[in-house]
Amino acid sequence: MEGQQPNREDRLLQEYLRTVKEHSCGLLSKIKMKKCFYFLSVAIFFSIEAIGTSAAIPHRIVIPDIDGYKTLKGELHIHTVFSDASVWPTTRIDEAMTEGLDFIAITDHVDARLLKQKNKGLMDFDRNESYKIAASAGKSHNVLIIHGGEISRGMPPGHFNTLFVSDCETIGKASDAHEDHYKAMKAGLAEARKQGGFLVWNHPHWERQAQNETRWYPEHTALYDAGMMHGIEIYNAFCGYSPEAHRWAMERGLTLICGTDSHVPMFLSVDFIKGDIRPVTLVFARERSLGGIREALDARRTAVFANGMVYGREEVLRPLMKALFEVSDVKYAEKKVTFRVVNRSSIPLTLRKAPGSEKIVYPRDMVIRPFEEVILTVYGLDNKKPIGLDEFDVNFAVMNFLIDVESPMTYSLHFE
């Protein structure tokens, strides 16, 4: 309405647009924009309409529910313009919805030194602003929004995410009160724990903080013993998979976590044209709700799906394999058995013949692509003769399902 005062979100967006315009040589004035845009880091950003057909539509991630639990797909580490990224919070919601995610945690840095727009005097906001904006948009887009933030310090102890908190302002101030990295982290995590937070050690293998080796320091033992480490990021899009973090998670009972840690629009970091998928944390929850996600994180019912690999505990990966690996149309003949296999997910399946099937012949190595349907044939050792077995097992090592470091899960089909 004419003369109506802009609300807080509109005012902040206008401040940021004005800032970007001043630093972009007038390019923004040539681009017609709405409220939810993709921002390029130095000032050029496009609305969905402006991108048009030049950008590929992201592939929606499809993964079936498992027995007794809903399979929720989400992002637990991502940034916006309210710390040091170039993306508006509502754009993160648009991305999540388009890619088929169920939840995201916007984890902007809570450290005062990393609130770049505020420090330059360009925008005025508190450290909960990105969550407030995202939570409002999430309701209309059916995306669950977890209130989170990232405490970023030198190594040790490094960076930690605080998830399911209520006030990032007090967490940031508690950390900012100390110059020593460990004392600052401990103070921030103590405040987050007081708020009921779920605490995650981020990217322990990030080369800027782990130049030559990935180490578990005495400071991490102290935080772990104090109940200030509940999960660990075993995959981060900046630095990939960490076998060390995976091993620590299994040894110490930490929840397996994944994050893109993205500071730019997703279409700049994920090649959707090639069909790539952003790394996600899979949460096996009793219900699709924030409470359901939190209960599953506490119970360690998670897996990481990244770069074609799935990392998780066997108690969730085995039912996941059962849910997505559909077998039907079994036909018995004297010399062979044929059956149809359908991959009901966005996860490729890399299969290798495993011990226990030495008396039958079937492909030793194969890949079943997402949603692909294949016919498999099993013969006896001499395909010109009857199989000669009353019953047998077709055993696979699922090479891209790791239930521990370098430990593929085995999966069997029984025929009789």
Task: Give the ranges of each region predicted by the language model.
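A metal-dependent hydrolase metal-coordination microenvironment
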Residues: 58-202, 219, 234-248
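Intrinsic-disorder-associated, low-complexity terminal segments enriched in Asp/Asn/His/Tyr and depleted
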Residues: 7-10, 16, 23
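Short, Lys/Arg-enriched N-terminal segments with co-localized hydrophobic residues
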Residues: 28-32
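Aromatic-lined carbohydrate-recognition surfaces of secreted/lumenal glycan-active proteins
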Residues: 200-212
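Charged catalytic cores and adjacent phosphate/nucleic-acid-binding surfaces used
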Residues: 7-8, 54-75, 93, 157-166, ...
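Bacterial N-terminal signal peptides
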Residues: 41-49
